[in-house]
Amino acid sequence: MRKVIIYILTLLALLAAGCGSEQPQPKELQLCSSMGTKLTEVIADSYSKAAGVKVNISYLPGGTQQERLDYLRKHKFDVWLGGTSEEYFMADEQHILQLYIAKESYKVPAELRNRTGQWTSLYLSYIALLSNKNNLHAYGLYAPETWDELLAPQLKDELAIADFDLGGASFGMITSIWQMRGKEQAMAYAAKLNAQQPVYTKGFGEAVDLVYIGKKTVAIVPLDYALQMEARHRHLFATVVKDANRTMLTGAAIMRSAAHPDQARAFLDYLMSDAGVELLPANGYHYMWHVKKYPYNDGRRELIGNVRVPVDDLSWTSVYKSEIIRQWRGAL
């Protein structure tokens, strides 16, 4: 009997020692970003410090929309940060997202949020034209503010546009003109723009570079980026497109394959919190507006003025994106 008691006590001691040696697993978040490196790191570092979570960052590679979605499907990410409304719409259609409504999403105007929780809208911008002032002066032109002004004879072979397949401001040009003017007038405009022989780049950064060095005169870019470039370089000038613009939304979504869903939800809640709202302006991003502050941002209203912005039909702009681009490129 004594041996049995000793055996039991020894076993209990070993079990207790084993339990005591177990260390809590560090909190982690696997983040895939479509944003630039610097901005992604600002967001990730801020959340990491606030929540005590290690954020592992990957970046979504280039390619077609389907190639990018396939990449997200094949890898086990918790959150996809920086996608566009069209991209999230298609990702949800292909069942690679999981639903979550961030705690303070109700404070966002209805037209700027996904009310069923497939993704969380975070930031908004508009379409801008970034011009090289030296080139404009040489051509005797004012900085363009409308799409029709890009048809000036002096601007033939002087336009830089990111490839439409990448979405963003360049694809927004197509959909805004199409929705505001109707298909017939949009195709007529597309034919005239195609005759201007714009150069198509692999990203809006490359388009900006061409304008910066003076090889091209005007680039179509997001407003927040255009304003940053204008502030840094005296020979660049940003204008908001007045006649057919677009509210360009970027956000975040939780992946269906998330290994850390609790951390993913906490991350989205943080980005929608007051701390998340102030994060970008506190780090110098003054022209990328948070959707939660949209109704109160007088600076945004003063900056964009009276622009005409359609309400996007995502079931059209997303599902038929390839066909829309094909027709635009083929307009003669």
For the regions a language model picked out, list residue spans one by one:
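A ligand-binding cleft/hinge motif common to bilobed small-molecule-binding domains
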Residues: E86-A91, Y212-I213, T217-H235
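Extracytoplasmic ligand-binding site segments that recognize negatively charged/polar headgroups
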Residues: S34-K38, H75-K215
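Hydrophobic residues within well-ordered alpha-helices
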Residues: L69-L72, V211-Y212, I254
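A bilobed periplasmic-binding-protein/Venus flytrap-type ligand-binding module shared by bacterial periplasmic
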Residues: L130-N135, M248-H260, L279-L280
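Extracellular/periplasmic bilobal clamshell ligand-binding domains
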Residues: D298-L332
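Early extracytoplasmic/lumenal segment of secretory-pathway proteins
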Residues: G20-M90
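Mature extracytoplasmic/periplasmic domains
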Residues: M255-D312
